[in-house]
Each structure stands twice: as structure tokens, then as C-alpha cells.
């Protein structure tokens, strides 16, 4: 295994911290993410793909079943990913009864920024040095000309749908969203507030 291969594997081999709590039945160990889930905190980190999306959807449904009145906090640090996987998270956020508060730490790009903006109104936040990026959907397809035409129509349909939803959540006119997503548009935390993607920049807990 080369050094570069080891570096690529390193994040996946990292140990997840464990938390030990004292209960009436003795000690109980949790991995850190399971312990934070008890506090209704979910992490959306890395590429948005089907497996990760299924886990996040399952966590949101579990927290809704546990308490349908209490907010869920979704922390986002993602470069984006697969549209259909992201839309499964989006639809669940809109479907469940609890408000989903979104917090960007690090970056929320592409599908990450879409999910950031999709949080409950008044409960969408960026940390001070986070970055947000919006753009149009990416796609590529090889095959017969007719199949390429079919896929081109599909991605244009998805683009129009996502622009409509982004306009709804940001309050920007659809024409502005169409123009600004034509190419990568990067924003600071304060820029994201002014654009309507989030409601405030959090510097410290109240």
C-alpha cells in the first residue's frame, strides 16, 4: 500500500470516541454520535450519498417518533453529492413534524447548501468561518443519442425544480436563483444570511 493509499484510508480507519455514562444499572458506553443523537443532534458530514442519506432519514424518523414536538438539530459539513440522496433527506425534513434546525460548520456546498436552506425558518445558522456554495446540478451520461437526450431533459427538469425550491426557502426571485446558480457561487456566513440561505451567524451559544 502506497503512502497516498494510506492517506485515503486514514479517515475511514479513524476511531470514533466513546462516551461512558453512569446509570442506575451501571456503566453504559455510547459512541459519540449515538450520545449526541440522544440530544437530538444529527451530523451530515462528507459526500451526500444513498447510505449516508438513509442513516440520516432513519435518525430523523426515530427522533420524531420519540418526541414529535421537540426540534432536531442538523449539523452540516458537506461538499454536496447525489441529488436523489439529498432529496430523500430534504423531503423527510419537510415531512416530519419537528422543526429541523440546520447549522453549517465548515462548508455547505451544492446539495449541502440546499439542505442548509431547507431548515425551519428562523432556525438556519452558519458558524462564522463556514463557507456556502450554490450551483446548478452536475451530470454526465454516455450512450445512444436518444438516451443522452432523455437524461438531458431529466437533469433540466431537476434543475428547474431545485431552483424553484431554493427560491422558496431563500426568498430570492427565481430569476436571481437561475442566474446565480449558473456557475459556482461562494458565500461567507454573512453573505449567506443576506442571500436568505440562513437566518443568522452563530458566534457562541446564547
Swiss-Prot record:
GO terms for cellular component: cytoplasm; endopeptidase Clp complex. Transmembrane segments: none annotated. It catalyses: Hydrolysis of proteins to small peptides in the presence of ATP and magnesium. alpha-casein is the usual test substrate. In the absence of ATP, only oligopeptides shorter than five residues are hydrolyzed (such as succinyl-Leu-Tyr-|-NHMec, and Leu-Tyr-Leu-|-Tyr-Trp, in which cleavage of the -Tyr-|-Leu- and -Tyr-|-Trp bonds also occurs). The keyword Cytoplasm applies. The active site is at 110 (nucleophile), 135. It is found in: Cytoplasm. It holds the Pfam family CLP_protease. GO terms for molecular function: ATP-dependent peptidase activity; ATPase binding; serine-type endopeptidase activity. GO terms for biological process: protein quality control for misfolded or incompletely synthesized proteins. Its EC number is 3.4.21.92. Keywords: Cytoplasm, Hydrolase, Protease, Serine protease. SUPFAM superfamilies: ClpP/crotonase. Belongs to the peptidase S14 family. HAMAP family: ClpP. Cleaves peptides in various proteins in a process that requires ATP hydrolysis. Has a chymotrypsin-like activity. Plays a major role in the degradation of misfolded proteins. Fourteen ClpP subunits assemble into 2 heptameric rings which stack back to back to give a disk-like structure with a central cavity, resembling the structure of eukaryotic proteasomes. This is ATP-dependent Clp protease proteolytic subunit. It comes from Edwardsiella ictaluri (strain 93-146).
Amino acid at each position: 500500500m502506497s503512502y497516498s493509499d494510506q492517506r485515503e484510508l486514514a479517515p475511514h480507519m479513524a476511531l470514533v470516541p466513546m462516551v461512558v455514562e453512569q446509570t442506575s444499572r451501571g456503566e453504559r458506553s455510547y459512541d459519540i454520535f449515538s450520545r449526541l443523537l440522544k440530544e437530538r443532534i444529527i451530523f451530515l458530514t462528507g459526500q451526500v450519498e444513498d447510505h449516508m442519506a438513509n442513516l440520516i432519514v432513519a435518525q430523523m424518523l426515530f427522533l420524531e417518533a420519540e418526541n414529535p414536538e421537540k426540534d432536531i438539530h442538523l449539523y452540516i459539513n458537506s461538499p454536496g453529492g447525489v441529488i436523489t440522496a439529498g432529496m430523500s433527506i430534504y423531503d423527510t425534513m419537510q415531512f416530519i413534524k419537528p422543526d429541523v434546525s440546520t447549522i453549517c460548520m465548515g462548508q455547505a456546498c451544492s446539495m449541502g447548501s440546499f439542505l442548509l436552506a431547507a431548515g425551519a425558518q428562523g432556525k438556519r445558522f452558519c458558524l462564522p468561518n463556514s463557507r456556502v456554495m450554490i450551483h446548478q446540478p452536475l451530470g454526465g451520461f454516455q450512450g445512444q443519442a436518444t438516451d443522452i437526450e432523455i437524461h438531458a431533459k431529466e437533469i433540466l427538469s431537476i434543475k428547474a425544480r431545485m431552483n424553484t425550491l431554493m427560491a422558496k426557502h431563500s426568498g430570492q426571485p427565481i430569476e436571481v436563483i437561475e442566474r446565480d446558480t449558473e456557475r459556482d457561487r461562494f458565500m461567507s456566513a454573512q453573505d449567506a444570511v443576506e442571500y436568505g440561505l440562513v437566518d443568522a451567524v452563530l458566534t457562541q451559544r446564547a
